Amino acid sequence: MALIAVGKSVCFLCNEVITEDTDYGGFPHFVPNKNDELFAFSDSPVHIDCVNAAPNGAKANRYADEFIKFTRPENRKCLVTGELITKYEDHIVIGYLTSDEASPLHRFNFRHIHRNNLARWADQVLLLSLLLALKESEDWKHHYGQLHLSNLINSITI
């Protein structure tokens, strides 16, 4: 979640300081791709009114809420079997990939897979090919370069 210092933090939407007399909040760091339209919201302090007035404010709220729900332990259910994944070493996490609902990657946002079920997952090859294409494109920019995508690709490769 964004760290907010009242009287010092600045809302990125209006460039005004966040004060005690305004409703404010912060987004979690939910968007890893700097080229995504919602990246500016990720890990940012904001005025609530500014988010509500922003053209993509509702969309940012929706994806941030989905991210928070996704990270809860009780929601870590394998997309192949529906069973809860309880051990970290068995857990493959596919987080936020894109806000572009027309992208074939969109349907893979916020998914959990038990490592033992990877070979049974019908969409494994499709996701792998999409991630490899994304890695080679200019559409993905991460502060750790391609490491984030490389780690995800490695985790879903048998």
Residue ranges and their predicted role:
Residues 6, 24-25, 57-58:
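A short linear-motif detector with a strong N-terminal bias
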Residues 54-85, 124-140:
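Polybasic, low-complexity binding patches
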Residues 45-56:
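Cys/His-coordinated zinc-finger cores
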Residues 116-158:
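C-terminal, charged low-complexity interaction regions
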Residues 2-4, 16, 44, 92, ...:
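Residue-level marker of intrinsically disordered, low-complexity segments enriched
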Residues 9-39, 48, 79-119:
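Short recognition patches in nucleic-acid-associated and regulatory proteins
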